[in-house]
């Protein structure tokens, strides 16, 4: 009897040996074509979850496959290591963020290595390491020197009790601080921005080049950039030199403007508010300041506003119109002001009704009568201009351009393209982030830290209270420095950078991770970039992927790198979902373990709440701790081994689809690997693995192959062909595994009449196809077959077309179009021969006897149909 499959022992053995061999190191120089396989790097939370396992397994299979296909492969890993959780740990547990993060990295690195990932760990990066963020700061200064980094006032989430800025994720659904419970306010602070809007058009247009990206992701980015073509118009304020600027995509409606609205935060709010309205306006501004952006712009929420008492002039018709402030207008969007055209915009229509504002119709349908217009809803379609001075009677689409020209000729405004995309606010009032390398001098302004003084390192002597300003803002010894320009006393910038900055260039660092002189060498970037296959979740479709594209374009324009797009192909893997139990009455989630009481297991088809006895809803949902539906990868690895976990992840669903965790299917993959183990060890014929078979280098033999051998070779090369097609572009791992299962079944079913060379070819083919998927098992069996080199260094298999040629085929016999049965005929038979073979077959004779054949229809390789009378 063969030795049993001991996954844990085998996996530990080969992980150690691969590390000793340096099997996964990136080739330093090679004439082979390159392939850069990359997974989005993780935040080091301390433990892998199944989403991680899926992401990194997918990329690993691709990397292993490409090595076997003759590519030099770069497959690195690192850590997106700055962020709020480490700072929270410091507050809650008294653990310094650096210590907490490094411990988590070590733990997760070990877990990744247990998965058997073929990662070049010599290129590992951690964004919190000074030798990494030194170069993040260097790149920031490149943006600063290019005029792409600047400061301006911006609203932030402000905790009035803790006196600190909060990230969006620290504000709960009721608008309260996660820590103090206070209602969060909106407050203006001076913040750092990157001018991503300068690249809006390039980011939008170059989406067309990304043919290897999912259309869904490109559409999401296009919508996020949000290009609008329209007009910039200015409305003078009565009795003032100031003007209110608005952007509109409907300049054809300008004669229908009956009011203008400012964002409450707009600087002109103070200018236009009259003494009579000051109290009302102040009260409204204070109320809106407590609301989040999401609350203010929610579609289902009534739009609230108040009059300021100020008056604007519509320059097109000279009419005086009221100026209001409203919660739905945001200062950060566009100009921070909008023109109100209630007759032709539904939101304006409702707002005008609620605030008793007038309406003026200026466009009517082509077939409408202007004498009797009674609006019940806004008319938002194209039509004929009315009540619009010299533009009356003109078709509204044509009037758009005419009105823009009129505005330009009279200095009322101009044509303008606007984007929904806003400049990237990168300031964070946090400690655990990359320090912004700027020194503020009263005389010189914002002065960049000299390159020789980088990195500006995070100080260690920090107290974390969770209250007040950023911990860095309290360290006077760290803050107070001489100005690099004039030498006078100055102060360091105490904000740190958004962690998305760190992840916007890490893929460039992997190309040259040990460089101490530059963030990367341009020639090495030219060799490895763009990333050939990027793998990560759809949740990063906009921010991370857009910011990475932005960084790449800026660095290309700075002539630091030769590529303008970072990722050639993108695979967004689906979520891993767990079975979830929920009480529909209380909304409470119930852990699966609670469905068992003592030895009595509750019927899984009709589960009840163990507390109330109510029926539970059962469905699949993304794994999370709060829903009690997660599966710990470490438990799966301990029970089944990494190869089984990998196989299940790859087999259960196509990579871009959501995957429903199923213990029974995990068992199924474990059984399959056991079957492969027994198949090969039985073939070797020695349970101790002492007597090894010798691999023949050729199938040439003096004897012709038997039918059974030909059938097996056809199955072997059919599997090679199908797996190659499954892994060609779309990486359909699940169907590739199905083909391997078919081949294993063919090998198991093969009779003793199969010769040694043919069976050996089948065994080796199965192992080579399976190697990228189950690397440990296949390596062990490969060596038990007598090989001394790694299976992962073997060339990918090529199809032998002659093996796929059929000697015989099955031919369908039909009479009057009805199938009567099948016969076996030579595959080489032509139409005449097929007709003769069919006509003379016993099967056909039974139906043709005594009949007159009027016509014979022959479809070569498929059927013969007799038309009789």
UniProtKB/Swiss-Prot annotation:
SUPFAM superfamilies: Anticodon-binding domain of a subclass of class I aminoacyl-tRNA synthetases, Nucleotidylyl transferase, ValRS/IleRS/LeuRS editing domain. Gene3D superfamilies: HUPs, Isoleucyl-tRNA Synthetase, Domain 1. It is an enzyme of class 6 (ligase). InterPro entries: aa-tRNA-synth_I_CS (IPR001412), aa-tRNA-synth_Ia (IPR002300), Leu-tRNA-ligase (IPR002302), Leu_tRNA-synth_edit (IPR025709), M/V/L/I-tRNA-synth_anticd-bd (IPR013155), Methionyl/Leucyl_tRNA_Synth (IPR015413), Rossmann-like_a/b/a_fold (IPR014729), tRNAsynth_Ia_anticodon-bd (IPR009080). GO terms for cellular component: cytosol. A motif ('HIGH' region) lies at residues 42-52. GO terms for biological process: leucyl-tRNA aminoacylation. One of its GO terms (molecular function) is aminoacyl-tRNA deacylase activity. A motif ('KMSKS' region) lies at residues 622-626. ATP binds at residue 625. It comes from the Bacteria. Its main location: cytoplasm. It is found in: Cytoplasm. It catalyses: tRNA(Leu) + L-leucine + ATP = L-leucyl-tRNA(Leu) + AMP + diphosphate. The keyword Transferase does not apply. Keywords: Aminoacyl-tRNA synthetase, ATP-binding, Cytoplasm, Ligase, Nucleotide-binding, Protein biosynthesis. Its EC number is 6.1.1.4. Belongs to the class-I aminoacyl-tRNA synthetase family. This is Leucine--tRNA ligase. It comes from Synechocystis sp. (strain ATCC 27184 / PCC 6803 / Kazusa). The lineage of its organism: Bacteria, Bacillati, Cyanobacteriota, Cyanophyceae, Synechococcales.
């Amino acid at each position: 009897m063969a030795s049993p499959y001991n996954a844990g022992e085998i996996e530990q053995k080969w992980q150690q040996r691969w590390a000793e061999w340096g099997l996964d190191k990136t080739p330093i120089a090679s004439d082979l074509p390159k392939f850069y396989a990359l997974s989005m790097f993780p935040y080091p939370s301390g433990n892998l979850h199944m989403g991680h396992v899926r992401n990194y397994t997918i990329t690993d299979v691709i990397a292993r496959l490409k090595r076997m296909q003759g590519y030099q492969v770069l497959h690195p890993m690192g850590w997106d290591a700055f962020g709020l959780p480490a700072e929270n740990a410091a507050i809650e547990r008294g653990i310094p963020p650096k210590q907490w993060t490094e411990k988590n990295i070590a733990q997760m690195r070990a877990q990744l290595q247990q998965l058997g990932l073929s990662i070049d760990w010599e290129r590992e990066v951690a964004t919190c390491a000074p030798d990494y963020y030194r170069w993040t700061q260097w790149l920031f200064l490149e943006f600063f020197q290019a005029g792409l980094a600047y400061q301006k006032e911006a609203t932030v989430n402000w905790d009035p009790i803790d006196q600190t800025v909060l990230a969006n994720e620290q504000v709960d659904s009721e608008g309260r601080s996660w820590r103090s419970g206070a209602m969060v306010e909106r407050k203006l602070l001076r913040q750092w921005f990157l001018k991503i809007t300068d690249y809006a058009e390039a980011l939008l247009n170059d989406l067309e080049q990304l043919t290897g990206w999912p259309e869904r992701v490109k559409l999401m980015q296009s919508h996020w950039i949000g290009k609008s073509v329209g007009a910039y118009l200015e409305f003078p304020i009565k009795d003032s030199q100031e003007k209110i600027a608005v952007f509109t995509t409907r300049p054809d409606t300008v004669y229908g403007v009956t009011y203008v609205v400012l964002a409450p935060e707009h600087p002109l709010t103070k200018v236009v508010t009259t003494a009579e309205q000051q109290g009302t306006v102040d009260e409204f501004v204070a109320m809106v300041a407590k609301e989040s952006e999401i609350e203010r712009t929610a579609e289902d929420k009534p739009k609230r506003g108040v009059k300021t008492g100020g008056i604007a002039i519509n320059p097109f018709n000279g009419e005086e119109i009221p100026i209001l402030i409203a919660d739905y207008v945001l200062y950060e969007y566009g100009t921070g002001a909008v023109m109100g055209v209630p007759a032709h915009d539904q939101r304006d229509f409702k707002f005008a009704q609620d605030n008793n504002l007038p309406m003026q119709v200026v466009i009517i349908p082509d077939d409408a009568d202007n004498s009797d217009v009674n609006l019940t809803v806004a008319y938002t379609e194209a039509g004929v201009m009315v009540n619009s001075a010299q533009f009356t009677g003109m078709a509204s689409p044509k009037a758009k351009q005419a009105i823009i020209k009129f505005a330009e000729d009279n200095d009322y405004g101009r044509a303008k393209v606007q984007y929904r995309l806003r400049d990237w606010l990168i300031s964070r009032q946090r400690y655990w982030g990359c320090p912004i390398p700027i020194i503020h001098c009263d005389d010189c302004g914002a002065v960049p830290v000299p390159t020789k003084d980088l990195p500006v390192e995070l100080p260690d002597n920090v107290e974390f209270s969770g209250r007040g300003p950023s911990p860095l803002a309290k360290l006077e010894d760290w803050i107070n420095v001489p100005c690099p320009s004039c030498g006078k006393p100055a102060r360091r910038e105490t904000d740190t950078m958004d962690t998305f900055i760190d992840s916007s260039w890490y893929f460039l660092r992997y190309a040259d991770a040990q460089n101490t002189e530059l963030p990367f060498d341009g020639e090495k970037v030219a060799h490895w970039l763009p990333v050939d296959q990027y793998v990560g979740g759809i949740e990063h479709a906009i921010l991370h992927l857009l910011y990475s594209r932005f960084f790449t374009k800026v660095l290309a324009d700075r002539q630091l790198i030769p590529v303008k797009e970072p990722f050639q192909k993108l695979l967004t893997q689906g979520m891993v979902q767990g079975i979830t139990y929920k009480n529909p009455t209380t909304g409470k989630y119930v852990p699966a373990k609670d469905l068992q009481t003592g030895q009595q297991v509750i019927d899984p088809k009709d589960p009840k709440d163990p507390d109330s006895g109510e029926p539970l809803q059962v469905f699949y949902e993304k794994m999370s701790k709060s829903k009690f539906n997660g599966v710990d990868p470490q438990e799966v690895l301990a029970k089944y081994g990494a190869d089984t976990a990998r196989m299940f992840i790859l087999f259960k669903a196509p990579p871009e689809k959501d995957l429903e965790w199923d213990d029974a299917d995990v068992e199924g993959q474990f059984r399959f690997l056991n079957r492969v183990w027994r198949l090969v060890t039985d073939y070797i014929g020695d349970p101790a693995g002492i007597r090894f078979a010798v691999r023949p280098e050729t199938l040439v033999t003096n004897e012709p192959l038997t039918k059974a051998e030909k059938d097996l070779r056809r199955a072997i090369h059919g599997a090679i062909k199908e797996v190659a097609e499954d892994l060609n572009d779309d990486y359909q791992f699940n169907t590739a595994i199905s083909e391997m299962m078919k081949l294993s079944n063919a090998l198991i079913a093969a009779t003793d009449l199969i010769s040694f060379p043919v069976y050996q070819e089948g065994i080796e083919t199965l192992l080579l196809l399976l190697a990228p998927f189950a690397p440990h098992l296949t390596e062990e069996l490969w060596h038990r077959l007598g090989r001394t080199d790694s299976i992962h260094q073997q060339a990918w298999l090529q199809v032998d077309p002659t093996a796929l040629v059929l000697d015989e085929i099955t031919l369908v016999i039909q009479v009057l179009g009805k199938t009567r049965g099948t016969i076996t005929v030579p595959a080489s038979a032509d139409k005449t021969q097929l007709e003769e073979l069919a006509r003379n077959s016993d099967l056909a004779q039974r139906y043709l006897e005594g009949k007159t054949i009027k016509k014979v229809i022959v479809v070569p390789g498929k059927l013969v149909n007799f038309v009789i009378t």
